[in-house]
A protein has these predicted regions:
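Glycine-rich FAD pyrophosphate-binding loop
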Residues: 22-44
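N-terminal Rossmann-like FAD-binding beta1-loop-alpha1 element of flavoenzymes
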Residues: 3-30
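Conserved small/polar residues in nucleotide/adenosyl-binding loops
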Residues: 152-153
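Proline-glycine-enriched beta-turn/loop adjacent to the NAD(P) cofactor-binding site
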Residues: 11, 34, 47
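The feature captures the short pre-catalytic strand/loop hairpin that immediately precedes
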Residues: 133
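Dinucleotide-binding Rossmann-like beta1-alpha1 core, especially the glycine-rich loop
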Residues: 47-127, 136
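Glycine-rich "substrate-gating" loop/helix at the edge of Rossmann-like oxidoreductase active sites
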Residues: 141-147
Length: 153
């Protein structure tokens, strides 16, 4: 059989590419090296929909992280897949680690990440009451969330 497009990988990204290709008059084949879908990166992922603050500014990854996070709630609704916009935290346990939090914040702002803030220990404990008292602060990305990736595919 001949195909117009080969999609490499049957994880979340491959599934979304295949879904998009299904809107066009093309024959597509999904090539997966494992014996089932979602056995690679998707399986190892914690199902987080990243806010986009960690990718190097100016890269395609940075752009797609932010765009992907923005479309995920609508896409999950269309696919009837559970999605929770619970945000994400990068927690610091020292002032040295807070320097890294500030770096991630600056990068996130450059990347166009919405609802990104640096929070102090008090606010962190309001969000996560059981977190260690040694935590000094965090980067809080309100736009991040989680999705049930195996249902998603």
């Amino acid at each position: 059989m001949k195909y117009d497009v080969a999609v490499i990988g049957g994880g979340v990204v491959g599934a979304l590419i295949s879904r998009e290709l299904s809107k066009y008059d093309v024959k597509a084949a999904v090539l997966e090296r494992c014996n089932d879908i979602a056995m690679g990166t998707t399986k190892a992922n914690s199902a987080i929909v990243h806010g986009g603050f960690d990718a190097v500014s100016g890269t395609v990854k940075a752009k797609l992280n932010v765009e992907g996070t923005a479309i995920m709630p609508k896409l999950c609704k269309e696919l009837n897949v559970p999605y929770r916009n619970n945000g994400s935290l990068v927690v610091a346990f020292s002032e040295k680690e807070m320097e890294h939090v500030h770096l991630l914040y600056d990068r996130g702002i450059k990347n166009g990440v919405p609802e990104l803030e640096i929070i102090d220990s008090k606010r962190l404990h309001e969000l996560e009451p059981n977190i260690s008292d040694e935590a000094v602060g965090a980067l809080y990305s309100k736009s991040a969330g989680i999705v049930l990736s195996l249902i998603y595919i």
